[in-house]
């Protein structure tokens, strides 16, 4: 089911799966990535286990509000509050919040800003920002080179946008999992085709964090599951380990051989871990 959530000058495109009377699970995707990267197979596995699942396009992705490149009209705090607007629109009092990468950063902020709305937290391939974060490694040399080479690049035209996105996918998906690259290319074509302004996704690198929530994760009181791949070349495993050590009541699910990804091969074990989290 599709629903557009509107408030002020913001429009957020959402999709839901399953029975709205079931426990809710809200999915927040990472930087520059639309909702399609939450695989429908993963969503349906959660539905089969009794969840009502919502995924949505963050601002500047997919069919949600876009802003001129370099001029995002929002902060990350406002992006995190978007999730609450969506819960309100679906009349959901409390949900499991699952975020990947930047979505995990937003999920951490939500758990601090709106603890009464968060039943539990799932952080997939997410970054640690609290005490000692400045000493942790981030991008691998290969990923850093890609962003150094293409950091200011704004592809013009459909084919250039698809080719650029495919190069980015290749640079950031160091993994022992197998992929059908033709299917990935088709996914990227869909991503570009459905976007209001595909280049506006670059705004996630311009948006600012203005509060201190990310340094206060010791205050998170809900059950938390950290999921991280051992060969993640965008946000190394140490970030997941630090999150699990710092957040009270957190557990760590390590995906051996997985990178910065949600791979179908891992769907079952992640879903089972979420079920265990919410027992």
Regions found by a protein language model. Give the residues of each.
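Conserved HGGG/HGGXW glycine-rich cap/lid loop of the alpha/beta-hydrolase fold
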Residues: 10-66
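Conserved acidic catalytic loop of the alpha/beta-hydrolase fold
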Residues: 77-95
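Conserved hydrolase catalytic core segment
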Residues: 93-135
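Flexible "cap/lid" loop of the alpha/beta hydrolase fold
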Residues: 121-155
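Alpha/beta-hydrolase
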Residues: 141-149, 153-215, 222, 242
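Short beta-strand/loop motif that positions the catalytic acidic residue
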Residues: 220, 226-228
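Acidic catalytic loop of the alpha/beta-hydrolase fold
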Residues: 231-235
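Catalytic active-site module of serine/aspartate enzymes centered on a nucleophile-bearing elbow/loop
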Residues: 250-279
């Amino acid at each position: 089911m599709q629903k557009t959530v509107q408030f002020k000058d913001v429009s957020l495109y959402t999709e839901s799966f399953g029975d709205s009377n079931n426990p809710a699970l809200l999915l927040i995707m990472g930087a520059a990535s639309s909702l399609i990267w939450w695989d429908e197979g993963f969503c349906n596995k959660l539905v089969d286990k009794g969840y009502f699942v919502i995924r949505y396009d963050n601002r500047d992705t997919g069919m949600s509000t876009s802003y001129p490149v370099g001029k995002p009209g929002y902060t990350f705090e406002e992006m995190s509050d978007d999730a609450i607007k969506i819960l309100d629109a679906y009349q959901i009092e409390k949900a499991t919040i699952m975020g990947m990468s930047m979505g995990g950063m937003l999920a951490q902020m939500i758990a601090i800003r709106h603890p009464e709305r968060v039943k539990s937290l799932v952080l997939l391939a997410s970054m640690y920002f609290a005490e000692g974060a400045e000493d942790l490694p981030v991008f691998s040399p290969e990923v850093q080179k890609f962003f150094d080479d293409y950091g200011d690049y704004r592809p013009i035209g459909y084919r250039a946008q698809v080719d650029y996105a495919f190069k980015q996918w290749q640079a950031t998906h160091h993994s022992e999992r197998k992929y059908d690259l033709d299917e990935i290319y088709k996914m990227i074509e869909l991503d570009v085709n459905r976007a209001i302004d595909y280049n506006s996704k670059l705004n996630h690198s311009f948006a600012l964090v203005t509060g201190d929530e990310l340094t206060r994760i010791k205050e998170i009181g809900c059950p938390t599951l950290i999921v991280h791949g051992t060969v993640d070349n965008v946000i190394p495993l140490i970030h997941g380990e630090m999150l699990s050590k710092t957040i009270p009541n957190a557990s760590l699910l390590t995906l051996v051989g997985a990178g910065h990804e949600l791979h179908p091969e891992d769907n079952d074990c992640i879903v089972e871990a979420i079920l265990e989290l919410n027992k």
